[in-house]
């Protein structure tokens, strides 16, 4: 429930589905485990897990959904070795080289044999729909993983008018100005980590950790055409995170003081605690996200 990464999207049209309508449409793409011949499966699961009963969870107008992916683990080297052995044996027996289509058919046979015995790996991706602010946020460490969830949601509901948030100024320019001037917007403070990249196409990369970012050494790098492409920040003493030049937020952490606010919620009802945590997280992020956009110079356009 405590998001660790944020990939942020803006609705280009208002999200008007009710929770009940969304629930019905998600059911058509509910997750089912891999069958013996499936290499992967992707679908919706209950965001509250065993403590929930629906594919959606809502609190104060915010909606939480969760997608699960199961993938069969088939090491490419194993398949390649088995294929090479089969090809060699058949070519020796028949005295001719196999054609490309024949090799592909053999590979399919090998996969068909191995899949039922392959181990599975599962992962879950949460997403938060904020209709009031026309925002959708995916807890994913990469844009690709977020795109997978968005594609599944689009398939489930027919259309999903969202785009990555576009700012008036590139984030790397603004972050570079912050380090150059040593002056951050209100409520934001520097931490001790950054990534600097050369503005040149094949230039160098400098990664700083556990370092004072206001030193002359850092300023010299910036003076030599380096741009800040990742920057560790703190907001309001409640959130710490690493901001990327693609506007992604990673390694998001909530302060202990914030996390303890729901300690009075009974532990005898896990669903109630999860609901309270979701309400707390979304309330905080609903304030943080517009503050971040404003600090970075504002959005290019929004509905």
From Swiss-Prot:
InterPro entries: RdgC. The keyword ATP-binding does not apply. Its main location: cytoplasm. It is found in: Cytoplasm, Nucleoid. The keyword Cytoplasm applies. GO terms for molecular function: double-stranded DNA binding. Keywords: Cytoplasm, DNA recombination. One of its GO terms (cellular component) is cytoplasm. HAMAP family: RdgC (MF_00194). NCBIfam families: PRK00321.1-3, PRK00321.1-5. May be involved in recombination. This is Recombination-associated protein RdgC.
């Amino acid at each position: 429930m405590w998001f660790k990464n944020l990939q942020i999207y803006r609705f280009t049209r208002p999200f008007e589905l009710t929770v009940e309508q969304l629930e019905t449409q998600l059911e058509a793409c509910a997750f089912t485990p891999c069958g013996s011949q499936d290499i992967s499966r992707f679908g919706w699961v209950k965001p509250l897990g065993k403590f929930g009963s629906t594919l959606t969870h809502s609190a104060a107008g915010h909606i939480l959904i969760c997608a699960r992916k199961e993938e069969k683990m088939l090491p490419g080297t194993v398949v390649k070795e088995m294929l090479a052995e089969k090809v060699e044996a058949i070519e020796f027996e028949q005295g001719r080289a196999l054609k490309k289509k024949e090799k592909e058919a053999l590979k399919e046979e090998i996969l068909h044999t191995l899949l039922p015995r392959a181990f599975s790996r599962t992962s879950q991706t949460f997403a938060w729909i904020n209709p009031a602010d026309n925002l959708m946020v995916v807890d994913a460490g990469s844009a690709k993983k977020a795109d997978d969830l968005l594609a599944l949601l689009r398939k489930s509901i027919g259309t999903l008018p969202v785009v990555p948030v576009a700012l008036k100024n590139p984030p790397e320019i603004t972050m570079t100005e912050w380090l150059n001037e040593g002056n951050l917007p209100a409520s934001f403070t520097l931490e001790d980590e950054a990534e600097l990249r050369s503005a040149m196409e094949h230039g160098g990369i400098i990664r700083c950790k556990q370092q004072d970012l206001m030193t002359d050494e850092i300023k010299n790098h910036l003076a030599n055409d380096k741009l800040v492409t990742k920057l560790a920040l703190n907001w309001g003493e409640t959130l710490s995170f690493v901001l990327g030049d693609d506007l992604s937020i990673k390694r998001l952490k909530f302060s202990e003081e914030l996390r303890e606010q729901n300690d009075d919620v009974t532990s005898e009802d896990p669903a109630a605690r999860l609901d309270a945590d979701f309400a707390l997280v979304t309330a905080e992020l609903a304030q943080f996200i517009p503050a971040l956009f404003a600090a970075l110079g504002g959005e290019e356009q929004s509905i």
